């Protein structure tokens, strides 16, 4: 899946880039990544206008004061809540032990092909899982680690292999994969197996990558040779899914969806205490896009006050706490396992409760100002 061009505009947002410095987490929790981006860019614009537009300095000073009031009112309320616990804030003290199994691919990349690639990817993941020596609460296999002839939902031999490891490790499993549906379609799934070896439920990816997981207007574009690399169109899932793991709740988003705040926030609203991103980043190559994706996961972890588990088939995989700190991560194009103890969290932030309310407020105010100027003129 060549996700590079489709995701590039999302990666450029200021709020995702600045998480590399872990700046002002309270702003992320109050306004979210997009709100943070709006604030930084608007402040920059106001400063430039104030410096360059001598005739309108009073107007821009007044606009700046209004803008600062709009920023600091909700931010002050959040900081007040942080001090006096006005919102429900319940960080569970019990940790869960989690393992990311990063099985890699023998021939990563959208255009690369090798014999029995899918079978070899599955075998790598099952063999790495067999190397885990002690019991764990949750084992995670990333996107594309199973599927087609190695789908646990369809092929009993695959489910049996996994059930043996479930029993040995007394673990829940969350497993990514894709499933052909007739000749023209497929599903991209996250399959949840409980610690008794039963397939409990699955999450189906809702947001396909344009020209990577489906071809818009395929019937009119079939003459383009390179589109043969995408022979099937993904069937969209309908909603978020919450998986119950004992007393804890987790949810998955799949790959490209991790670029969009609404899927992670939607899972938090549905009750998720841990967010898992299943992804296949093979087409990113040695570029910086794997690191950029982790930055996005960090921004979303801070904004929603949730730990995020970033599981990538070819790397980089990472454990990220609710403050956006990377606890541990893997390298690119390696076969390895990554262990961490994670604290489930079920508190709320202004962003997780109200979404991009600040952005909409600014749009409404701008529209009112526009109408007022039209009336006065």
Identify the meaning behind each predicted range.
Residues 1-7, 11:
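Single conserved hydrophobic/aromatic residue that forms the stacking wall/gate
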Residues 14-27, 344-346:
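Juxtamembrane membrane-water interface segments that cap and precede transmembrane helices
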Residues 26-42, 351-361:
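Membrane-interface loop-to-helix entry segments
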Residues 46, 68-82, 360-371:
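Hydrophobic core of alpha-helical transmembrane segments in multi-pass integral membrane proteins
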Residues 47-56, 370-376:
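Structural signal for the C-terminal ends of transmembrane alpha-helices
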Residues 56-70:
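Membrane-interfacial entry segments at the cytosolic side of transmembrane helices
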Residues 67-101, 109:
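Hydrophobic alpha-helical transmembrane segments in integral membrane proteins
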Residues 112-118, 138-377:
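Solvent-exposed soluble domains appended to multi-pass membrane proteins
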């Amino acid at each position: 899946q060549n996700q590079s061009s489709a995701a590039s505009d999302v990666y450029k947002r200021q709020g995702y880039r600045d998480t590399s410095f872990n700046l002002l987490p309270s702003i992320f929790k109050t306004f979210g990544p997009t709100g943070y981006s709006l604030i930084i860019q608007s402040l920059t614009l106001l400063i430039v206008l104030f410096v360059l537009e001598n005739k309108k300095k009073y107007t821009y000073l007044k606009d700046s004061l209004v803008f600062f009031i709009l920023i600091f009112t909700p931010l002050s309320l959040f900081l007040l809540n942080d001090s006096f616990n006005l919102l429900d804030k319940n960080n569970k003290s019990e940790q869960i032990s989690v393992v990311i199994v990063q099985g890699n691919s023998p021939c990563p990349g959208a255009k690369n092909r090798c014999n029995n690639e899918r079978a070899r990817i599955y075998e790598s993941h099952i063999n790495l899982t067999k190397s885990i020596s002690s019991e764990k609460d949750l084992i995670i296999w990333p996107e594309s680690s199973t599927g087609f002839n190695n789908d646990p939902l369809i092929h009993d031999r695959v489910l049996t292999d996994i059930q043996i490891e479930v029993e040995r490790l007394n673990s829940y499993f969350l497993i990514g994969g894709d499933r052909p549906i007739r000749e023209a379609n497929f599903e991209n799934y996250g399959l949840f197996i409980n610690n008794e070896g039963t397939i409990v439920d699955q999450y189906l990816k809702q947001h396909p990558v344009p020209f990577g997981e489906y071809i818009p207007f395929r019937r009119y574009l079939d003459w383009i040779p390179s589109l043969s690399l995408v022979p099937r169109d993904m069937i969209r899932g309908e909603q978020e899914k919450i998986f119950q793991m004992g007393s804890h709740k987790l949810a998955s988003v799949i790959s490209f969806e991790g670029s969009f705040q609404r899927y992670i926030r939607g899972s938090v609203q549905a009750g998720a205490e841990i967010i898992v991103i299943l992804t296949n980043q093979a087409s990113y190559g040695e570029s910086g896009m794997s690191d950029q994706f982790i930055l996005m996961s960090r921004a979303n972890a801070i904004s929603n006050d949730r730990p995020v588990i970033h599981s990538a088939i070819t790397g980089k995989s990472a454990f990220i706490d609710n403050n956006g700190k990377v606890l541990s991560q893997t390298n690119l194009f390696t076969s390895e396992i990554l262990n961490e103890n994670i604290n489930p969290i079920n508190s709320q932030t202004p962003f997780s409760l109200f979404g991009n309310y600040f952005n909409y407020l600014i749009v409404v105010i701008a529209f009112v100002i526009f109408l007022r100027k039209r009336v006065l003129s």
